[in-house]
């Protein structure tokens, strides 16, 4: 027997089931800071200067969750700094500035020697012959600062949706950032400056690389990037001769994402892209000494591009040589599970990256070309409970930035969640799928859709005509309604279970139906050969449900595999019964039926 309830049940999603950003705030981020420290960490002076140069009046400040404790004081300091700058003014309209006068047919429209109309006509005013009133100069408008504290997506991306709610002119993004290009608003990036134990970092470096001629690239998280030049100078003074450093640039698709490699003099070094024809420095001969824990997406992207990667942990004393081979193996297993998926869901996890719409279009076309069905859904923060509502989906692909597209803790998800790069490998045939170790997480690597050329369209029509002629010849030879293409297709097996999969390409099976219709139409012609009257067996796999004439694998799943499809749908399954009059009356006595016996209550 179930225990007695002492409180009302909790119907909301537990907090531990939410998908949260993996960065844990360190002690130096949560302790109290002075005003001077906040000015330095959040770069108040530089931010105010850029806002003043841009002439922006409505400023949105986007803080990650662990920095919200500093938001009120940052707003006060920024407003005080902005107050010392000249206030922006709203420019007067072009009509007011250009209104002049020549001649007016209606003298009654004048007022004390001035034009009372002030109407813009071809840039000369109304033509009354009187001087138009001088435009009134607008008063300076005070700047408004807003805190954007509820980011629906990953904290590394600029939340343009929240900024548009306050009609912001510019967004100031604080903390770590993926530096993905935005589509609408200008952005001021403030990575914030964190304290680094320089002596401990130098000791770890010398212990890991005792050889003074070791080829190493110094790299740091964006919050520690300010310490890289000084560390490089001190290490070179200690005798290291083959050291390089990195600087932050806005280039997620770089050989090192959002970084350029520079020498001791700050000159950029050309990097080879790994191909045989490319020239420049080969990063596979260099190790990377990374300050602070990088995101997992960066680790996977770098593991095949550099010799090895050493991570210096700033939040603890543990530092080690990192290997991503096991994690890459798990990612490869995830994408293999989608090779036989018939229905793929597209999760839109960003609305701010500039090319997300074209990337969605490309992914849809890739899925359709493979004979599979796709459904697009816009979500906020991902969690297993959201995706579990769609049992029809065999797997998911995330459309987001190169950091947030990777779902690290995906053990709780019922279906695999992969990146667009992994989807491209999953849709490839077994002969074409080659795993080289390269990996990418975002939509930057999605190939744009290829526009159809007129010549290609014409050749495609010729191929369709030839296919119809061939189909007519097959029908004349007695093949009936069977689709030879589907019969000749090789069987597909699930790589995990080894079972035969018959529904991995549902849209390709649906596309074979119009061919059969064309065959029937061609047989109605007078000169067409007579159709065979013999009965043929049609495969049930080709009988898919359709919605408004469009084949829908989701509707097919609802029809064949759902045990409950809504209220009132079980009326046909239960046998109907004749309505009979029941017992009636009052508590003193009841009557069974219209003329039934009366039962008295004792």
Swiss-Prot record:
The organism's place on the tree of life at top rank: Eukaryota
The UniProt record lists the keyword ATP-binding: no
Subunit description: Component of the 2-(3-amino-3-carboxypropyl)histidine synthase complex composed of dph-1, dph-2, dph-3 and a NADH-dependent reductase, predominantly cbr-1.
Protein name listed in UniProt: 2-(3-amino-3-carboxypropyl)histidine synthase subunit 2
GO annotation, biological process: protein histidyl modification to diphthamide
GO MF assignments: 2-(3-amino-3-carboxypropyl)histidine synthase activity; 4 iron, 4 sulfur cluster binding; metal ion binding
Protein function: Required for the first step of diphthamide biosynthesis, a post-translational modification of histidine which occurs in elongation factor 2. Dph-1 and dph-2 transfer a 3-amino-3-carboxypropyl (ACP) group from S-adenosyl-L-methionine (SAM) to a histidine residue, the reaction is assisted by a reduction system comprising dph-3 and a NADH-dependent reductase, predominantly cbr-1. Facilitates the reduction of the catalytic iron-sulfur cluster found in the dph-1 subunit.
Classification via InterPro entries: DHP2, DPH1/DPH2, DPH1/DPH2_1, DPH1/DPH2_3
Binding site for [4Fe-4S] cluster: 157, 178, 401
Pfam families in UniProt: Diphthamide_syn
Subcellular location(s) of the protein: Cytoplasm
Keywords carried by this UniProt record: Cytoplasm, Iron, Iron-sulfur, Metal-binding
Coiled-coil region list: none
Cofactor stoichiometry and binding remark: Binds 1 [4Fe-4S] cluster per subunit. The cluster facilitates the reduction of the catalytic iron-sulfur cluster in the dph-1 subunit.
Bias-annotated ranges (Basic and acidic residues): 449-461, 517-528
Pathway: Protein modification; peptidyl-diphthamide biosynthesis
Gene: dph-2
Feature: compositional bias, Acidic residues: 480-489
Gly residues bias spans: 584-594
Necessary cofactors: [4Fe-4S] cluster
Chief location of this protein within or outside the cell: cytoplasm
Similarity field: Belongs to the DPH1/DPH2 family. DPH2 subfamily.
């Amino acid at each position: 027997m179930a225990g007695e309830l002492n409180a009302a049940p909790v119907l909301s999603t537990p907090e531990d089931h939410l998908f949260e950003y993996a960065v844990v705030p360190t002690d130096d981020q949560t302790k109290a800071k002075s005003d001077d420290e906040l000015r330095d960490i959040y770069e108040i002076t530089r931010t105010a200067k850029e806002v003043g140069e841009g002439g922006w009046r409505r400023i949105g400040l986007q803080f990650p969750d662990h920095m919200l404790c500093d938001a009120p004081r940052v707003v006060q300091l920024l407003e005080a700094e902005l107050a010392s700058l000249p206030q922006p003014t709203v420019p007067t309209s072009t009509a007011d500035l250009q209104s002049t006068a020549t001649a007016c047919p209606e003298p009654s429209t004048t007022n004390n020697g001035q034009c009372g109309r002030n109407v813009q006509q071809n840039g000369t005013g109304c033509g009354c012959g009187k001087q138009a009133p001088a435009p009134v100069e607008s008063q300076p408008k005070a700047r408004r600062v807003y805190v954007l504290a509820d980011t629906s997506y990953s904290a590394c991306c600029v939340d343009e949706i929240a900024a548009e709610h306050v009609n912001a002119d510019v967004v100031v993004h604080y903390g770590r950032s993926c530096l993905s290009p935005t589509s609408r608003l200008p952005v001021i990036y403030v990575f914030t400056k964190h304290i680094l134990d320089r002596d401990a970092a130098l000791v770890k470096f010398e212990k890991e690389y005792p050889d003074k001629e070791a080829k190493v690239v110094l790299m740091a998280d964006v919050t520690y990037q300010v310490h890289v030049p000084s560390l490089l100078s001190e290490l070179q003074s200690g005798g290291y001769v083959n050291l390089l450093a990195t600087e932050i640039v806005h280039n997620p698709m770089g050989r090192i994402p959002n970084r350029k490699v520079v020498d001791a003099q700050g000159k950029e070094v050309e990097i080879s892209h790994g191909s045989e024809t490319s020239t420049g420095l080969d990063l596979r001969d260099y190790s990377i000494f990374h300050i602070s824990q990088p995101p997992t997406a960066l680790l996977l992207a770098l593991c095949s591009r550099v010799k090895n990667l050493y991570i210096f942990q700033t939040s603890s004393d543990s530092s080690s040589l990192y290997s991503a081979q096991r994690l890459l193996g798990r990612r490869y297993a995830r994408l293999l599970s989608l090779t036989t998926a018939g229905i793929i869901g597209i999760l839109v996890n960003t609305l701010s990256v500039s090319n997300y719409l074209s990337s969605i279009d490309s992914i849809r076309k890739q899925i359709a070309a493979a004979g599979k069905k796709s459904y697009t859904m816009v979500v906020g923060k991902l969690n297993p409970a959201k995706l579990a509502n769609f049992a029809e989906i065999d797997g998911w692909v995330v459309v987001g930035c190169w950091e947030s597209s990777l779902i690290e803790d995906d053990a709780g998800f019922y279906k695999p969640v992969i990146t667009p790069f992994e989807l491209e490998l999953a849709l490839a045939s077994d002969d074409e799928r080659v795993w080289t170790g390269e990996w990418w997480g975002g939509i930057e690597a999605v190939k744009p859709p290829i526009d159809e050329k007129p010549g290609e369209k014409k050749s495609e029509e010729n191929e369709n005509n030839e296919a119809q002629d061939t189909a007519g010849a097959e029908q004349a030879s007695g093949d009936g309604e069977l689709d030879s293409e589907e019969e000749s297709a090789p069987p597909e097996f699930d790589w995990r279970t080894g079972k035969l999969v018959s529904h991995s390409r549902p849209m390709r099976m649906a596309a074979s139906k119009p061919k059969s219709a064309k065959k029937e139409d061609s047989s109605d012609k007078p000169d067409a050969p007579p159709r065979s009257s013999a009965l043929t067996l049609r495969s049930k796999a080709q009988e898919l449900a359709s919605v408004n004439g469009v084949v829908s694998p989701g509707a097919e799943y609802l029809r064949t595999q759902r045990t409950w499809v809504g209220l009132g749908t079980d009326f046909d399954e239960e046998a109907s019964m004749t309505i009979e009059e029941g017992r009636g009356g009052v508590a003193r006595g009841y009557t069974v039926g219209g003329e039934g016996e009366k039962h008295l209550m004792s």
